[in-house]
C-alpha cells in the first residue's frame, strides 16, 4: 500500500461479467477475487453496558485498560503494523504492574480523553470503517506503552 502497488478500495457493490464495481462507482477488471472479511470484535460474555464494540470500536486506554472497570484488562486486542506478540508481552508487563500496585493509572477523564484522541487519529488516517479501529503502528505503540509503564510507577 505504501509503495502504491496495492490500491485500497471501498466495499464491493456488485460484480458483472469481468469487472468488480465498488460502492463509490469505480470499476476494476479482475481475474480473481480473494474474499478476506477480517473479523468482528465481540464479547458475548460481557453485558453491553460493560463493553460494546459497536462498529468494532473499543474504548480502552492504550487498547488495554477499561477506564470504567478497575481490573478489567485486554491483551493483544490490536492490529499492529508489525508483530502482536511483543505488544502483548509489554501489555502483560504493564497489567502485572497495575495488579501488583507497582503502577497506577491516570484519572478516568484523562484516559477517556486519550481514547478519544486515538479514535480521531484513526479516523483522520484511515477511512471510517470497522476495519482499522484497532490499528496501531508497532514502534510508536510500543513506545507509548513503555512511557505509560514508566509514568504509572510515579503514580503510586
Task: Give the role of each language-model region.
Residues 1-111, 123-156:
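Flavin (primarily FAD) cofactor-binding/catalytic cores of flavoenzymes
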